[in-house]
Amino acid sequence: MSRLLPLLRSRTARSLRPGPAAAAAPRPPSWCCCGRGLLALAAPGGPRALGTHPKKEPIEALNTAQGARDFIYSLHSSERSCLLKELHRFESIAIAQEKLEAQPPTPGQLRYVFIHNAIPFIGFGFLDNAIMIVAGTHIELSIGIILGISTMAAAALGNLVSDLAGLGLAGYVEALASRLGLSIPDLSPKQVDMWQTRVSSHLGKAVGVTIGCILGMFPLIFFGGGEDDEKLEKKN
């Protein structure tokens, strides 16, 4: 998988407030949002505040000009260069194959797409659930006793720790998955946009997260059962 997953998860708008000259520049049309509209995306937008989106401003999707612009501003210069090269290559292949009738992906290709998307999400689900259980249990047995917080509050704090850890561990999970030797599925641009490919990709992610979360429950083996719960209730 590419490095786009953690960026999509925490993408921010790092654009600066434009000056008077930039504010007077015309805004790009709404149809130039992806791929073939890269030149329009580079044009400055209207005045925007520094930092993340305001509370009342909805987060734009990547199929809009504003959403694509925010995503581009969140990337480093090397990542933008790599993304631009891949977009040009992808669009050139799509234009060359535009007049050709693309065949639907074969069952073998769909199976490969499924596996390629499932493996990284097994790692994500495993780490997320395991860290949440361990952190939530320790919070309940330490801070929970002192502050008298409930089990659900301790679980919520454990989930916070798990999410923070996931931001830093996402890159390592992707690097480990790439070392398994699974290359990007060999599909044409038209085959990538077909519904069969998208369904296979989403199913792979869903199954991967499910398997990872089930495997991530292994810390429960090392924690006690009813006796520890009774002792905790007596202490509270």
UniProtKB/Swiss-Prot annotation:
Domain of life: Eukaryota
Ranges of the Extracellular topological domain: 128-138, 227-236
Transit peptide: 1-57
Main location: membrane
Claim: Ligase is one of the keywords in the record: no
Cited InterPro entries: TMEM65
Localization in the cell: Cell membrane; Mitochondrion inner membrane
Alphabetical GO biological process terms: cardiac conduction; cardiac ventricle development; regulation of cardiac conduction
Alphabetic keyword roster: Cell membrane, Membrane, Mitochondrion, Mitochondrion inner membrane, Transit peptide, Transmembrane, Transmembrane helix
Transmembrane segments: 107-127, 139-161, 206-226
Topology relative to the membrane: Multi-pass membrane protein
Ranges facing Cytoplasmic side: 58-106, 162-205
GO cellular component, one term: mitochondrion
Subunit record text: Monomer. Homodimer. Interacts with GJA1. Interacts weakly with DSP. Interacts with SCN1B.
Protein's job: Essential for maintaining proper cardiac intercalated disk (ICD) structure and function as well as cardiac conduction velocity in the heart. Its association with SCN1B is required for stabilizing the perinexus in the ICD and for localization of GJA1 and SCN5A to the ICD. May regulate the function of the gap junction protein GJA1 and may contribute to the stability and proper localization of GJA1 to cardiac intercalated disk thereby regulating gap junction communication. Regulates mitochondrial respiration and mitochondrial DNA copy number maintenance.
Protein name listed in UniProt: Transmembrane protein 65
Natural source organism: Bos taurus
Lineage, opening ranks: Eukaryota, Metazoa, Chordata, Craniata, Vertebrata
